[in-house]
């Protein structure tokens, strides 16, 4: 195995500031596992990092946290994971292990948490390091491409299973037909909920895909009256739950009066600004439970991998482009054009 590798690194804060650099291949010591990366999905957070939209980012750092690969080396304190195992990994690289959240394995809430691809070098490289506790073995029939979607799917499982307990009887709105919205849709249909998927005119191709993936109703909110659609479907009561994957304040405020009294609003997408103006009148008067859903934790991953392995998620429809690691910039540009669903980077295309 070579002692050096290539990686896509955010070198400094600000717009772009990206470079394709040489790095030393990390060593798997203690409880760490070294993974030869097969695929990495480009996440919306990677694009925000590229654009310099996060304050005080850790730099330099190799990006990438949605990945799959094969174990090539294990540390001395790794009893279960073996060289040759096909794996994916949670994004948690370090937690304090002492706070109340860590004691409940709610690692996404640990105030000292460090994540792969954000504070610790990530998977947009030939190799990535992970801790054994974060590793999940892949079923034999689950492809590396599909497994690289485990992380964003786990985030959606967290929102639907843990934070809001979506049920068969529920009628819901999912706002934003990007990758996260489409993952939420497919989970909801697996559960059996009635789904109204919303977007705007430029999302036409994504709304069409949403219909193909099982959305009961699709609504272009620039052309159709969402309130009228919801009131007709729910006899005026409103939907049971709204999941926002858009991070668009106008969309959020348009949906709040359409939630059934004592219903739920689940914020999955991130807003561009820390402070936003919300329709608090609807939240109060309708007794809406407004819920934040942050990332994922260990409890979400087995469900996500099971959904992928059983075919509940349409892997082929979700992955619309693949690029070798050397063409990472073209891959980022393609994502930023806004016409793709999920773009994958192949770190070792000659081997997987």
Swiss-Prot record:
| Cofactor field | Mn(2+)
Catalytic activities: D-arabinitol 1-phosphate + NAD(+) = D-xylulose 5-phosphate + NADH + H(+)
Q: Where does Mn(2+) 1 bind?
A: 43, 65, 151
Q: Which SUPFAM superfamilies match?
A: GroES-like, NAD(P)-binding Rossmann-fold domains
Domain of life of the native organism: Bacteria
Query: What terms describe the molecular function in GO for this protein?
Result: metal ion binding; NADH dehydrogenase activity; NADPH dehydrogenase activity; zinc ion binding
EC code(s) of this entry: 1.1.1.301
Positions bound to Mn(2+) 2: 96, 99, 102, 110
- Pfam families named among the record's database cross-references: ADH_N, ADH_zinc_N
* Gene3D superfamilies xrefs: Medium-chain alcohol dehydrogenases, catalytic domain, NAD(P)-binding Rossmann-like Domain
Return one Gene Ontology term, BP aspect.
Answer: arabitol catabolic process
Broad EC category: oxidoreductase
Q: Which UniProt keywords apply?
A: Manganese, Metal-binding, NAD, NADP, Oxidoreductase, Zinc
**Cofactor binding remark:** Binds 2 manganese ions per subunit.
Q: How does activity depend on pH?
A: Optimum pH is 6.8-7.3 in the reductive reaction and pH 8.3-8.6 in the oxidative reaction.
Which first-to-last residue range defines the signal peptide? none
- What does the activity regulation annotation say? Inhibited by EDTA, 4-hydroxymercuribenzoic acid (PHMB), mercury and zinc ions at a concentration of 2 mM.
Q: Which family does it belong to?
A: Belongs to the zinc-containing alcohol dehydrogenase family.
What is the annotated role of this protein in its UniProt record? Involved in the arabitol catabolism via the arabitol phosphate route. Catalyzes only the transformation of D-arabitol 1-phosphate (Arb1P) and D-arabitol 5-phosphate (Arb5P) into D-xylulose 5-phosphate (Xlu5P) and ribulose 5-phosphate, respectively. It can use both NAD and NADP.
Quaternary structure, from the entry: Homotetramer.
Q: What is this protein called?
A: D-arabitol-phosphate dehydrogenase
Source organism (scientific name): Enterococcus avium (Streptococcus avium)
């Amino acid at each position: 195995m070579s002692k050096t590798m290539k990686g896509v690194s955010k070198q400094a804060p600000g717009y772009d500031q990206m470079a394709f650099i040489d790095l030393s291949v990390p060593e798997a010591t203690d409880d760490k596992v070294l993974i030869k990366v097969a695929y990495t999905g480009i996440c919306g957070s990677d694009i925000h990092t590229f654009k310099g939209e996060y304050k005080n980012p850790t730099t330099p750092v190799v990006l990438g946290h949605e990945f799959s690969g094969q174990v090539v080396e294990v540390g001395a304190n790794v009893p279960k994971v073996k060289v040759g195992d096909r794996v994916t990994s949670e994004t948690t690289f370090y937690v304090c292990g002492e706070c109340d959240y860590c004691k409940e394995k709610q690692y996404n809430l640990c105030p000292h948490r460090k994540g792969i691809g954000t504070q610790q070098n990530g998977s947009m490289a030939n190799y990535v390091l992970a801790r054994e506790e974060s590793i999940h073995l892949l079923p034999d029939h689950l492809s590396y491409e599909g497994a690289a979607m485990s992380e964003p799917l786990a985030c959606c499982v967290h929102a639907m299973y843990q934070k809001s307990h979506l049920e068969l009887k529920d009628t819901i709105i999912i706002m934003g037909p990007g990758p996260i919205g489409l993952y939420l849709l497919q989970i909801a249909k697996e559960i059996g909920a009635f789904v109204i998927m919303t977007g705007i005119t430029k999302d036409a191709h994504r709304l069409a895909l949403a219909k193909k993936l099982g959305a009961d109703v699709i609504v272009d909110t620039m052309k159709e009256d969402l309130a009228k659609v919801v009131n007709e479907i729910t006899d005026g009561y409103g939907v049971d739950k709204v999941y926002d994957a858009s991070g668009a304040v106008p969309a959020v405020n348009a949906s709040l009066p359409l939630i059934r009294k004592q219903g739920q609003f689940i914020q999955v997408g991130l807003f561009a600004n820390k402070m936003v103006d919300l329709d608090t009148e609807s939240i109060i008067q309708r007794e809406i439970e407004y819920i934040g859903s942050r990332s994922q934790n260990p409890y979400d991953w087995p469900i996500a991998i099971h959904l992928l392995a059983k075919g509940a998620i349409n892997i082929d429809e979700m992955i619309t482009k693949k690029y070798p690691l050397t063409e990472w910039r073209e891959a980022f540009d393609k994502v930023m054009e806004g016409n793709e669903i999920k773009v994958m980077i192949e770190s070792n295309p000659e081997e997987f």
